[in-house]
Amino acid sequence: MNPRIENLLQISADTSEDIRQQVPDMDAGFDDSDRKWEIIVKTAGSLDRIRSIYTNAEFTQLLCGYWIVRTTIDSIEALATEPEIIFIEKPKALYFELYAAKSEACVNVAKAEETQYGGVTGKGVLVAVIDSGIDIENGEFLDDSGKTRIKTLWDQTTGITYSDKEINSILEDYRNGAVKTLPARDVTGHGNEVAVIACGRSGVASDADIIIVKLGNSGGNAYIRTTQIMKGVDYCIRKAIEYSQPVAVNISYGGTYGNHEGSSIFEMFIDDCCSTYRCSICIGVGNEGEGRTHYSGQLVSGNVLDEELAIGDYEPQISIQIWKRAMDNARIELIAPTGERLVISERNAGVVHHNIKNMRIVSGIWTGTILYG
């Protein structure tokens, strides 16, 4: 395996399509229509030379030396050998991280304290919400004269951007009945609720100017890709620089892939953007409830750790990630309710296919055994 290519990308490319499509983190970024992968690239220096060589690839430049590239797997392997390339990783699937009403977010308490003590209201600051859209006619996002507080809006689903003047013109036509539909409509309600909490007139930053990015489609999938978030962050910061205003960017999405230690290109991009301009990037965490999708423990050399995994009926697939330090050795064994065993060790690391009841996920209690040392 090429050390400059993320192992999940290499594993996903080597996995059969019917299996890969069952795992969102493996399938994210692959376009079946042209057999190309969308990848995130961290670079050192200019890519002018590389772009002149890989003419069939599509390059999108982001801030801080990051690029999003669409190309074939063969070109990815060749690209990884170029001296300008530091690392390549694939997009991951992200999901909503906020399902709370304004009262549950303690906004009412914050507003009461703001009134009592004369707290900050966000005046002169931009609040950017990267989410599922916005209802631009909502009074929460209008000023006292009925004009929009949104300075710019980018709808990734259509590729169209709107200025505040264009939004006000659309609103006037909508009120007069000249138009029946509004751009960037939030059909899920998630983005609207997030924006109300963050920068609505009854929200926290009630006097802030607003930037909205409606995230694009993911080929009919129920998730958003990290690359869509990265493009949104890039857009918001560039606009803040153009307006000469500080910006607070809200991202109420999250995922379960990775070690969550800040070592992925996506996480490093967020960190680097924070030091590029006067900006703060806020990302939601938690929201797992009783899902209990994460677990951590400590292993002692020579000991065996047994953990149970409860898998419900009709689960089409299950993705298990075990993260450890590179210098530690561990032998991992999965025991199905049927008694079948799958042993994973350093010797057979990589892509391993194992049939259990003709590839069906067996519901019940699975046992994960880890031998350390």
Residue ranges of model-derived segments:
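Stable alpha-helical elements in mature extracytoplasmic
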Residues: 75, 190, 194, 229-232, ...
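Structured segments of extracytoplasmic/periplasmic soluble domains
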Residues: 82, 156, 197-200, 232-235, ...
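A general sequence property marking short-to-moderate contiguous segments
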Residues: 1-18, 281-301
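Subtilisin-like serine protease catalytic core
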Residues: 115-227, 244, 248, 278, ...
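Autoinhibitory N-terminal propeptides
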Residues: 1-67, 74-116, 126, 139, ...
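Non-catalytic, beta-strand-enriched accessory regions in extracellular/secretory proteins
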Residues: 299-312
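Substrate-binding/access-modulating region of protease and related hydrolase catalytic domains
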Residues: 217-299, 314-342, 349-373
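Conserved short loop/turn motifs at secondary-structure junctions
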Residues: 63-70, 253-259
